[in-house]
Amino acid sequence: MGRSISVSFGLLVVFLSLSGTGADFDCPSGWSAYDQHCYQAVDEPKSWADAEKFCTEQANGGHLVSIDSKKEANFVAELVSQNIKETRRTDFVWIGLRVEDKRQQCSSEWSDGSSINYQNWIEAESKKCLGLEKQTRYRKWVNLNCGQPYRFTCEI
């Protein structure tokens, strides 16, 4: 009997130590959790700059989404597909990346300051801001005019 109690206690310790690994990660109401971050697809068209401003005002550390892996890209694509209403203006969704210099070279970081570790370009053009394209089920990045109003995804 003493052995089964110590085994049960050991399993309880393992369970409690694993419970803090992200399964219980809390996000504000209306946000979705993925890999220790919170995401919100916003169904209100704004220019890239206004969308970035909106995201920074939502929560401390908020920005337009930065996509660091294929898994995160798939999560964001599903989030957008499920939360953005189908209209003529849903062909594109802003992400937090834009061209910063005059030679149209991509900036070396996302709007949140993180490095670019993953890329999924559909084509290179002379427009400065990037978004996800509906035709690719929101999985490929396309250059867009920064002043155009599109839906967007915030991340904290």
UniProtKB/Swiss-Prot annotation:
GO terms for molecular function: toxin activity. The keyword Ribonucleoprotein does not apply. It comes from the Eukaryota. Pfam families: Lectin_C (PF00059). SUPFAM superfamilies: C-type lectin-like. One of its GO terms (cellular component) is extracellular region. Disulfide bonds join C27-C38, C55-C154, C129-C146. Residues 34-155 form the C-type lectin domain. Expressed by the venom gland. Residues 1-23 form the signal peptide. InterPro entries: C-type_lectin-like, C-type_lectin-like/link_sf, C-type_lectin/snaclec_domain, C-type_lectin_CS, CTDL_fold. Belongs to the snaclec family. Shows greater sequence similarity to the alpha than beta subunits compared to other heterodimer snaclecs. Interferes with one step of hemostasis (modulation of platelet aggregation, or coagulation cascade, for example). Heterodimer; disulfide-linked. This is Snaclec A11. It comes from Macrovipera lebetinus. The lineage of its organism: Eukaryota, Metazoa, Chordata, Craniata, Vertebrata.
